């Protein structure tokens, strides 16, 4: 399973949840086109109805095991901010969301207002953490859910995330199977032909984990929900 373009139909919320909710294209312009206001509204509607997806719940469970009470959380590509909302409800002191697409902002603001939590969240738009990590303050826990499969240089991205993490990093990725790699190539070829900048990547899981290990974060948590593998690493 690899990242593909979002579709209008409602995404299943069981462990068979699709991978199409994860990925960003290479440039912000394409990102806004692919992940538009309609897509953001759908995610917000699903969250209001069903809560976190199973894979997002695993991400939050790991963060909880590290310790959310009084903690700061930084999420890269957090979209509507559903994981952050739940982290705040579990005792996190403050969260920061770094996002490339402006389409999520209206829905994120509405969700924050509904929860009465706007004053505990910072949302940064147009910041590429891998390129400008110094633009983002460090946090106790750094989250990258359904993000690394979209970024061409996972080493820079995860390295930057590790550099911002005081205590832990948790990320999710699709499996690197033969089918996943073939599908990624097929999807990317289609988008190239249609002039769409969206790209999907099936990075090697062990190589991604090694990036974090090389920066002092050792894997302590591995769980699977449908196509999503969740890895949590803590500061040694």
Where are these regions (language model features)?
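Class I SAM-dependent methyltransferase SAM/SAH-binding core
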Residues: 80-128
């Amino acid at each position: 399973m690899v990242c593909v373009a979002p579709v209008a139909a409602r995404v299943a919320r069981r462990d068979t949840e699709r991978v199409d909710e994860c990925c960003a294209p290479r440039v912000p312009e394409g990102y806004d086109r692919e992940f538009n206001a309609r897509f953001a509204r759908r995610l917000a509607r699903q969250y209001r109805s069903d809560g976190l997806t199973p894979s997002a719940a695993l991400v939050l469970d790991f963060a909880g095991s590290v310790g959310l009470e009084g903690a700061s959380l930084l999420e890269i590509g957090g979209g509507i901010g559903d994981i952050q909302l739940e982290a705040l409800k579990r005792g996190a002191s403050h969260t920061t969301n770094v996002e490339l697409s402006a389409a999520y902002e209206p829905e994120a603001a509405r969700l924050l207002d509904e929860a009465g939590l706007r004053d505990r969240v910072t949302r940064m738009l147009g910041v590429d953490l891998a390129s400008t990590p110094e633009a983002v303050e460090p946090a106790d826990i750094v989250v990258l859910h359904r993000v690394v499969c979209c970024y061409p240089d996972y080493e820079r991205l995860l390295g930057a995330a590790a550099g911002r993490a005081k205590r832990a990093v948790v990320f999710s990725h699709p499996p690197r199977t033969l089918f996943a790699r073939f599908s990624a190539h097929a999807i990317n070829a289609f988008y190239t032909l249609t002039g769409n900048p969206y790209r999907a990547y099936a990075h090697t899981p062990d190589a991604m984990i090694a990036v974090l290990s090389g920066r002092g974060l050792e894997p302590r948590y591995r769980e699977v929900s449908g196509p999503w593998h969740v890895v949590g690493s803590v500061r040694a």
